[in-house]
């Protein structure tokens, strides 16, 4: 239990924290002056943390009220003040003390009771806690921690209070310090201002002191001067006085006594004199100073005036300086703005100068191009004039020959007899009959001679052909003309053609162009051969147009070409674009496509030509089939050759035709009519340089290239005909020369190719031993074909690629990996192909590559597509009629090529046998090679092209041998090439076989069906030979087509011309 003292201590404390009564009680007790209450309140000061229970607070309330009551009494007593009696005050104070003590005692009693009750409760709680041992320990620890925490809180509160106080004190100190700082700063500034003022005052005082020193020094000097002057005067006076005094001394001494009173008078006199002197000296000095002062004042006035004027000048100068400064700033700003404008103008002028220079360069290039074009057009015009003259001569000669030979021969001679009657009438109209008879008798031998004679006549006609390349091209062109002329004669009338075919071969290209009107005169003939090819084609609106258009292609070509360079352009363009898109090709695509397709030659154009740049490029396709067929149709069977003939004469004779049909088609069809004028013209002024170059854009490029325009184009235009052909396989070799190369790149390339164009036109015709004979004649003739081997070599990029690739497309299809290898191997074979081409130009060219250059190129897009499969058969079939029509002319070629043609036909037959077997494979394989070849072909095509070019030189060296050997050795060198490249031998043989199977079976089966169906319609005469030959050869040419289609697709892919394939697909779909 708690002691009473502790209870007393505890009783007073709870009032302060719990109820605030402690403080009130303390205040009242202080006012009352009761020390007991003061001590009680003091005892409560330590009791802050106690008072846990409400009992103590409740018990404290009565004492609080009592204390309040007693305090009010004490206040009343205090309010009375000292005015009351001391006794009353004492009595009251004692009463109050007693009351307070009683109240306290009562409060203590209450507190004790409450505390005792509280202690009892606490003891009960303690007992309960003791029973709960674990809980008791935790409670103690908890309470201890709570007490410690409370103490810490109190301490921290107190510390925080102290810190706050300290912070406040510090803030106050800081405020005082800042105030002192401000005051000190103000005082310092004041002191500094005072120091500056004092410094200024000191400077002024110093200046005044210096002036005063100067004045004092001057006054001292004057004083010293005056002193000396005065002393001197005094000395002088003394001297005077002494001098007088010496004489007067005695007198004075004597009379001193008497004269004592005179001394004073003397002194007075002296004084008067001295005063007079002093006055005088003073006046003089004053006057001197006055004068000096006047002078100084005048000088000061002058100086002040000068200073005033100087100050005015200074102020004026300052104003001027400010004005000049402002002007300078303005001028600087204007200068900067002008400099910025100048820099901007310079930049603009530089940009303008650059643009003007670019425009000047563009205009110079355009001017140069236009000059080249003008030169080419002039050359074409000259060539056309020469052609016109030759055609006029040929027309008369042919009319005579036709009249005489029709009377002499009569009707129905066999194509061989026709070729014997027609064979080689030289381009010279005077010697036509004699040389034709000689050519009839000695076919193969005389062909070379006729080639020479035709070359001579062509040289006579085209005097600009100076170079050997031009001569070779002229020979090739004359051969093409002779062949085409013979073919035209054959197509015009089998007997008349056979009788006059040599002449027409030599002249008909020009004559068909010039005669094409005449042949156009006989649209029946113009139609009949072509229409003999297909009544549907004859019926086709293209051919329905063809009578006029037969006239127009031939007339548009020949008359237009003969007529003017503009028409030379137009014939060329009419040939190239016009033929590519004109009746020839209008007929041709339609004719090529089918009688049904013939319904819309324009549609045939648009699907075949318009739809696909490849078909647009394969106007060679459209032309080679269509132009090959429809020129024959449009122009006549002769004109069916005349596309080649018109093309070849144009190609052979006119750079415009060679350029425009070939170039207009290749560049224009491929590029533009302007370029159509001359890919080589644009490519090389060399093509502009000579008609032969004009004839062979390639001729401008190289003799070998001059030997073959395609050589020029194929190496030059496309790195290889394969490349040039694949991009424009239909166009550049085929269509670029497709007017001629429509027959074949071979025609544009050389007479042999001009023959093979005819043969290319009728590779199926040329497929007939007749045209292989014609090719052998072309090859027998071919120094030009030896040229054409080069051409074929240069073709061979397409041809070598097409012989090997064209042959190996099937194997490339079957062995496309091998072909990738063998193409690389073929690059050697490109050499051997050059040989094989030199020897095979007839082989590969004659039916296969002659077709395949143009047709494979022309058809390569088509063969890549189903159109190639369908339309190519139609083309071959359409061509086969043309070839049959031409087969009438080829009889001489048949006689010549009977020997070579038979091995080819045998090979073709064996290919036919193999064709059905491989027919299905090639289809899949062609698609594979298309994908696979693109990989192999780009580099391999280049390698083969380079090697073919290399091989082209040797082949050019041995042109005649190769020409003769080409047919005899085609198989041998094919076997040699196969021996060289075992993969290639199979590729070559298979190419022949597989090419025959691939495209042939695609085309052959279709072509055999369609050609057989069309051949009976076209010419039953042609059908017997043409069908067999077409069947034998179409397989090979169609192979080359498939091969070249595959190769062209590879090279097209190489040349990034899958876009052409897409148009070809569209064209194929349109054709379908």
From Swiss-Prot:
- According to the record, the residues making up region (Disordered) are 454-1072
Location of Phosphothreonine modifications: 832
The lineage's top-level taxon is Eukaryota
Coarse class of the protein's main subcellular location: cytoplasm
What are the recorded GO MF terms, alphabetically?
Answer: protein kinase binding; protein-containing complex binding; protein-macromolecule adaptor activity; structural constituent of cytoskeleton; structural constituent of postsynaptic intermediate filament cytoskeleton; toxic substance binding
Report the SUPFAM superfamilies cross-referenced here: Intermediate filament protein, coiled coil region
Q: Where are the sequence repeats?
A: 507-512, 515-520, 521-526, 527-532, 533-538, 539-544, 545-550, 551-556, 557-562, 563-568, 569-574, 575-580, 581-586, 587-592, 593-598, 599-604, 605-610, 611-616, 617-622, 623-628, 629-634, 635-640, 641-646, 647-652, 653-658, 659-664, 665-670, 671-676, 677-682, 683-688, 689-694, 695-700, 701-706, 707-712, 713-718, 719-724, 725-730, 731-736, 737-742, 743-748, 749-754, 755-760, 761-766, 767-772, 775-780, 781-786, 787-792, 795-800, 801-806, 807-812, 815-820, 826-831, 851-856, 859-864, 879-884
Entry comment on modification after translation: There are a number of repeats of the tripeptide K-S-P, NFH is phosphorylated on a number of the serines in this motif. It is thought that phosphorylation of NFH results in the formation of interfilament cross bridges that are important in the maintenance of axonal caliber.
Q: Which GO terms describe its biological process?
A: axon development; axon regeneration; cellular response to estradiol stimulus; cellular response to hydroperoxide; cellular response to leukemia inhibitory factor; cellular response to oxidative stress; cerebral cortex development; hippocampus development
What are the entry keywords?
Cell projection, Coiled coil, Cytoplasm, Cytoskeleton, Intermediate filament, Phosphoprotein, Repeat
Q: SMART domains given for it?
A: Filament
Q: Name one Pfam family in it.
A: Filament
Subcellular locations according to the entry: Cytoplasm, Cytoskeleton; Cell projection, Axon
- What positions belong to coiled-coil segments? 98-132, 174-222, 293-380
Q: Which residues form the IF rod domain?
A: 94-409
Q: Where is the composition biased (Basic and acidic residues)?
A: 501-584, 600-620, 720-774, 781-953, 963-1072
Q: Which residues carry this modification: Phosphoserine?
A: 74, 343, 414, 417, 501, 516, 522, 528, 534, 540, 546, 552, 558, 564, 570, 576, 582, 588, 594, 600, 606, 612, 618, 624, 627, 630, 636, 642, 648, 654, 660, 666, 672, 678, 684, 687, 690, 696, 702, 708, 714, 720, 732, 738, 744, 750, 756, 762, 776, 782, 788, 802, 808, 816, 827, 846, 852, 860, 880, 937
55 X 6 AA approximate tandem repeats of K-S-P-[VAGSE]-[KEVTSGA]-[EAVK]: region residues? 278-643
Listed InterPro entries: DUF1388, IF_conserved, IF_rod_dom
Expression induction or repression = Down-regulated after nerve injury.
Q: How does it assemble?
A: Forms heterodimers with NEFL; which can further hetero-oligomerize (in vitro). Forms heterodimers with INA (in vitro).
The record's function comment reads: Neurofilaments usually contain three intermediate filament proteins: NEFL, NEFM, and NEFH which are involved in the maintenance of neuronal caliber. NEFH has an important function in mature axons that is not subserved by the two smaller NEF proteins. May additionally cooperate with the neuronal intermediate filament proteins PRPH and INA to form neuronal filamentous networks.
Supply the name of the protein.
Neurofilament heavy polypeptide
The record lists the organism as Rattus norvegicus
Q: Quote the gene name from the UniProt entry.
A: Nefh
């Amino acid at each position: 239990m708690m002691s009473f003292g502790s209870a007393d201590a505890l009783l007073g404390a709870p009032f302060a924290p719990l109820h605030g009564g402690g403080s009130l009680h303390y205040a009242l007790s202080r006012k009352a002056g009761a020390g007991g209450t003061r001590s009680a309140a003091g005892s409560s000061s330590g009791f802050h943390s106690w008072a846990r229970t409400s009992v103590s607070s409740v018990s404290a309330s009565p004492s609080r009220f009592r204390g309040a009551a007693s305090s009010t009494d004490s206040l009343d007593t205090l309010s009375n003040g000292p005015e009351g009696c001391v006794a009353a005050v004492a009595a009251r104070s004692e009463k109050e003390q007693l009351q307070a003590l009683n109240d306290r005692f009562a409060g203590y009693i209450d507190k004790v009771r409450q505390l005792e009750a509280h202690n009892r409760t606490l003891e009960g709680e303690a007992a309960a806690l003791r029973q709960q041992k674990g809980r008791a320990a935790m409670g103690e620890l908890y309470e201890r921690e709570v007490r410690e925490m409370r103490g810490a809180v109190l301490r921290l509160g107190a510390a925080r209070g102290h810190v706050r106080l300290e912070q406040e004190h510090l803030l106050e100190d800081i405020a005082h310090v800042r105030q002192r700082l401000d005051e000190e700063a103000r005082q310092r500034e004041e002191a500094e201002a005072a120091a500056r003022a004092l410094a200024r005052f000191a400077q002024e005082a110093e200046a005044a002191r210096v002036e005063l020193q100067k004045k004092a020094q001057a006054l001292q000097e004057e004083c010293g001067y005056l002193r000396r002057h005065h002393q001197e005067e005094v000395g002088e006076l003394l001297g005077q006085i002494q001098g007088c005094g010496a004489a007067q001394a005695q007198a004075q001494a004597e009379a001193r006594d008497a004269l004592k009173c005179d001394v004073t008078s003397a002194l007075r006199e002296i004084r008067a004199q001295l005063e007079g002197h002093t006055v005088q000296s003073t006046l003089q000095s004053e006057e001197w100073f006055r004068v000096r002062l006047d002078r100084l004042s005048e000088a000061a006035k002058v100086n002040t005036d000068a200073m005033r004027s100087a100050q005015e000048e200074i102020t004026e100068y300052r104003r001027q300086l400010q004005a000049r400064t402002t002007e300078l700033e303005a001028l600087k700003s204007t200068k900067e703005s002008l400099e910025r404008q100048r820099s901007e103008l310079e930049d603009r002028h530089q940009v303008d100068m650059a643009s003007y220079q670019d425009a000047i360069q563009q205009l110079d290039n355009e001017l140069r191009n236009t000059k080249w074009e003008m030169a080419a057009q002039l050359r074409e015009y000259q060539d056309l004039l020469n052609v016109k003259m030759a055609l006029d001569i040929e027309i008369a000669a042919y009319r005579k020959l036709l009249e005489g030979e029709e009377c002499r021969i009569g009707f129905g001679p066999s194509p061989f007899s026709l070729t014997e009657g027609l064979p080689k009438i030289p381009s010279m109209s005077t010697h036509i009959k004699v040389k034709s008879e000689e050519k009839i008798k000695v076919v193969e031998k005389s062909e070379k001679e006729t080639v020479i004679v035709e070359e001579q006549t062509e040289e006579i006609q085209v005097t600009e052909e100076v170079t050997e390349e031009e001569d070779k091209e002229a020979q090739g062109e004359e051969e093409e003309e002779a062949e085409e002329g013979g073919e035209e004669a054959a197509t015009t009338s089998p007997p008349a053609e056979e009788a006059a075919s040599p002449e027409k071969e030599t002249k008909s290209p020009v004559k068909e162009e010039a005669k094409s009107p005449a042949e156009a005169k006989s649209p029946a003939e113009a139609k009949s051969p072509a229409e003999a090819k297909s009544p549907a084609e004859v019926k086709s609106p293209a051919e329905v147009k063809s009578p006029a258009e037969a006239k127009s292609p031939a007339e548009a070509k020949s008359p237009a070409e003969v007529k003017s360079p503009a028409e030379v352009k137009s014939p060329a363009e009419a040939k190239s674009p016009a033929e590519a898109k004109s009746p020839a090709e209008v007929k041709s695509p339609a004719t090529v496509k089918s009688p049904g397709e013939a319904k819309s030659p324009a549609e045939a154009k648009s699907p075949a030509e318009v739809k696909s740049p490849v078909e647009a490029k394969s106007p060679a396709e459209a032309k080679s089939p269509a132009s090959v067929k429809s020129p024959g149709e449009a122009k006549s069977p002769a004109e069916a050759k005349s596309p080649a003939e018109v093309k070849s004469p144009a190609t052979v004779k006119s750079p415009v035709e060679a350029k425009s049909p070939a170039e207009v088609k290749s560049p224009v069809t491929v590029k533009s009519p302007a370029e159509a004028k001359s890919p080589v013209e644009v490519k090389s002024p060399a093509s502009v340089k000579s008609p032969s170059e004009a004839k062979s854009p390639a001729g401008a490029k190289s003799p070998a290239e001059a030997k073959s325009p395609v050589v020029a184009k194929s190496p030059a235009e496309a790195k290889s005909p394969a490349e040039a052909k694949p991009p424009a396989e239909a166009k550049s070799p085929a269509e670029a020369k497709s007017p001629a190369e429509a027959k074949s790149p071979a025609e544009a390339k050389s007479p042999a190719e001009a023959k093979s164009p005819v043969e290319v036109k009728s590779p199926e015709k040329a497929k007939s031993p007749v045209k292989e004979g014609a090719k052998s004649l072309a090859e027998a003739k071919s120094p030009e074909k030896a040229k054409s081997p080069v051409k074929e070599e240069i073709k061979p990029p397409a041809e070598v690629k097409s012989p090997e690739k064209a042959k190996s497309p099937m194997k490339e299809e079957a062995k496309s990996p091998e072909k990738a290898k063998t193409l690389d191997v073929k690059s050697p074979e490109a050499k051997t192909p050059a040989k094989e081409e030199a020897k095979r130009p007839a082989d590969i060219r004659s039916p296969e590559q002659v077709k395949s250059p143009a047709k494979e190129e022309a058809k390569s897009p088509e063969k890549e597509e189903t159109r190639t499969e369908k339309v190519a058969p139609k083309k071959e079939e359409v061509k086969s009629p043309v070839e049959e029509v031409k087969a009438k002319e080829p009889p001489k070629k048949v006689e010549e090529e009977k020997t070579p043609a038979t091995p080819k036909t045998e090979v073709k037959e064996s290919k036919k046998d193999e064709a059905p077997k491989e027919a299905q494979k090639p289809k899949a394989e062609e698609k594979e090679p298309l994908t696979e070849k693109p990989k192999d072909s780009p580099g391999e095509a280049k390698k083969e092209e380079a090697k073919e070019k290399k091989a082209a030189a040797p082949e050019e060296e041995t042109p005649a041998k190769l020409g003769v050997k080409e047919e005899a050795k085609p198989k041998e060198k094919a076997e040699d090439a196969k021996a060289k490249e075992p993969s290639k031998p199979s590729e070559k043989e298979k190419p022949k076989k597989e090419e025959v199977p691939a495209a042939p079976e695609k085309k052959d089966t279709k072509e055999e069906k369609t050609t057989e169906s069309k051949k009976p319609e076209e010419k039953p005469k042609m059908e017997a030979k043409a069908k067999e030959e077409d069947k034998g050869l179409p397989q090979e040419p169609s192979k080359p087509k498939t091969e070249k289609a595959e190769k062209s697709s590879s090279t097209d892919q190489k040349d990034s011309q899958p876009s052409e394939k897409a148009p070809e697909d569209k064209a194929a779909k349109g054709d379908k």
